[in-house]
């Protein structure tokens, strides 16, 4: 399956197919006519897929280099950037060369930001290997690194030349990372697709859902494609993709990215903000309970056991907080979301979340 993100001169294809990694060289040749390629990956992913990617690229006539970083959220830091730049310089990559981000969301965001800033920008291709990256972070052109004060505080809008999604790579993912990705899949159903949400709730586990996985990945990517085409720079409808993220980012930060994964934190954020919105009469009653049921099916938590006042200081630094005005994403109902302008006082009295 091939989708196209239509952004004029920044348009790019998204390829979704089982076993497509073996065609990487052919697909890269369609969007890149240079010679050198740097594969940036991590020490979990590269041992699994580095060889097949390097072979297919070499067979297509490319000169391949690789740089492998430690896995995990702490790698997505400002301190990792000089290491990538040094590897690019040592391999003598120029502005006419290409970087491939081979990994999950951390590698995609970090390597994408390195590509956006090295020599004022070189081409890059996303090959996401986690469910979360396949359905969300690899598409849309947001690249970033974290700072101690919060997630994604230094970044850019920088689109890849292509995204190559192989659902087969998910067979090597531990259950924890599958649940992580399902947090974002549930989000898409909540904000834009009631049918998708109901499909998720009709199944009893991820294993039960697996035969429909390629279809579900494609549906999530298509929703994101439509939203990004309408709002490339996050000023309007694209904000809807942040459903659950206001609380999620602060929960992740509070625990130094060592307890809840991103998808788990998004699950907590979606449920808790919907519960608050229902109490304020801003969301149809019963939505929070439906979200909780979906989270239970896919082994995701619904609370962090933190007092809200512990989180509100970090919320004030959130990117969605502009001039002390906070845009939170709420649901009218499942599948129908909207942006609600408020401020940090929205969370007053929420108690333990």
Kindly label every feature range from the protein language model.
Residues 65-67, 100, 125-127, 162-165, ...:
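Hydrophobic/aromatic beta-strand patches that form the interior of the parallel beta-sheet core
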Residues 15, 113-205:
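A glycine/threonine-rich phosphate-anchoring loop and its flanking beta-alpha core
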Residues 85-102, 111-126:
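Non-catalytic interfacial helical region
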Residues 106-113, 134-135, 250:
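Short glycine/serine/threonine-rich phosphate/pyrophosphate-binding segments
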Residues 183-185, 282-353:
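C-terminal charged capping/lid subdomain of soluble metabolic enzymes
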Residues 17, 39, 77, 128, ...:
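Residue-level signal for inorganic ion chemistry
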Residues 1-97:
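ATP/NTP phosphate-donor binding region
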Residues 198-309:
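Active-site segments that bind and position negatively charged phosphate/pyrophosphate groups
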